[in-house]
């Protein structure tokens, strides 16, 4: 019989429109995990989602004249293995920018 040890893992998903702000947030999370003796893997880049909006330039006629706008959503995943209570407490107190969406799964 083989015995498998269940290892705790925290998966953090980050989303942002600004890539630089997202990378700074990832660096802060990894630095916090490293200072509390937890092993962090990542950031793993996920595919960037592009959403394109087409808008008519003129309010009345000239449907041939259109303008395109796009939003790009950059995404990253960070896995933290064997977190301690100190690691979780430090991650909860971490101050991250408001433009970064964070989703945490235990």
Curated annotation (Swiss-Prot):
UniProt superkingdom: Bacteria
Keywords: Ribonucleoprotein, Ribosomal protein
InterPro entries in the record: Ribosomal_uS10, Ribosomal_uS10_dom, Ribosomal_uS10_dom_sf
One GO term (biological process): translation
GO CC annotations on file: ribonucleoprotein complex; ribosome
GO molecular function, one term: structural constituent of ribosome
Keyword Ribonucleoprotein belongs to the record: yes
Extent of the signal sequence: none
Pfam families: Ribosomal_S10
Complex formation: Part of the 30S ribosomal subunit.
Functional summary from the UniProt entry: Involved in the binding of tRNA to the ribosomes.
NCBIfam families xref list: PRK00596.1 (NF001861), rpsJ_bact (TIGR01049)
Family affiliation: Belongs to the universal ribosomal protein uS10 family.
Protein name: Small ribosomal subunit protein uS10
